[in-house]
Amino acid sequence: MTKNIGLFWLKDDFRITKNFALIEATNKHDQVVAFYLFKEKQFENQEAQKWWVRESLKEFEKKLDLYNIKLEIVKTDTFKSFFVKLFKKKNYSIYWNRTYEPNYLKFDEFLIKNFKDNEVKFNLSKGNILNEIGEIKKGDGTPFKVFTPFWKNAEKFYLEKIPSKNKKIIKCKKKVSFFNKTINTKEIFSQKKWFKKFESYWIPSEQRAFTELKKFINSGIDNYSE
């Protein structure tokens, strides 16, 4: 275990199960802080999304509490302006999961370069996908052009590299803070109250997602359109 704090950048991966960056952070640090960057302008005309994010953060925070991990929400105009300040800080390592949208992939390159330049240890983990882009290739290194052999190889590749069940999120020794200016989930609210009706339809949480998936597999998949 390293003595400095492990920072986990929470993006859109509100899950405990197979959260590889969070697993890596807690396996290497006694103290871990999860942080979420709230870009208020992004949600100016997205009240439904704001509600979903707030409720997801509330549920995820409860899960993190079980592991003595504090969730800190930082309000920022842009990701870049936040990280430019973070580069100057010391005594931390940072972990995050890859997001596969082009803008995020490009931003990862910016982060990697600057963390290296500032001698900050970092770990970029696989996102919520089966295999990374470009991992599945033919013996000669070229991409598959027919689906069936591609899928057979993709399945075999995935099953062979499933992480050990022994590697999981470890409970930290104590809960600590890292950032000076933070907000709480109550400050992420909508001026309009029409979102209240959502609460009768959806419960944003990892556990609810598993429940709905199980229900679909047991009773819905047979009637699902081909």
Task: Indicate residue ranges for each PLM-predicted region.
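Trp/Phe/Arg-rich N-terminal binding region typifying the photolyase-homology
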Residues: 1-162
